[in-house]
């Protein structure tokens, strides 16, 4: 199913001074149009072609692709790597960052790495429980997704270089 780009009364939303995101997802949202995103589960391999093959399925149907972060409590290619690969191919991307099983330094690294690779959209999540995964282990929850969201905003806006202290 394809969605038509129809403007909504009261849109487009103004762009704030100093803001320079030309992203497709942002353009759709600012127009007030219905935005469609989908999740892409990263492969268990290091082969970029596995990522591109999965993304091509959604060509012409979605406004952005969410790269999941350790979905199902399993190990996959990182969300940062998937976003970097897809951005090079021109896809609009949303980097998911899960706070499950990561300490603050790992979360900081993901957010800063994503920003360095051109990621403009982040979805902060608690993450799937480890009981869903394929390895026997105990889950670790260092931070809440809301706290991570608050802190990631400051990093992505360039107002803070160290987060979640």
Located regions from the model:
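Glycine-rich, proline-tolerant flexible connector loops at the mouths of alpha/beta enzymes
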Residues: 42-46, 59, 63-80, 129-141
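Short, acidic/polar
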Residues: 45-58, 78-79, 104-111
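Flexible, glycine-rich active-site loops centered on histidine and acidic residues
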Residues: 103-151
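Structural motif corresponding to the early beta-alpha repeats
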Residues: 91-107
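Acidic (Asp/Glu)-rich catalytic clusters
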Residues: 26-31, 55-60, 80-90, 111-119
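Alpha-helix-loop-beta-strand connector modules within alpha/beta enzyme cores
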Residues: 73-96, 141-165
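N-terminal amphipathic alpha-helix/helix-capping segment at the start of soluble metabolic enzymes
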Residues: 2-38, 45, 49, 53
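Hydrophobic faces of well-ordered beta-strands that scaffold small-molecule active sites
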Residues: 36-40, 63-67, 93-97, 122-124, ...
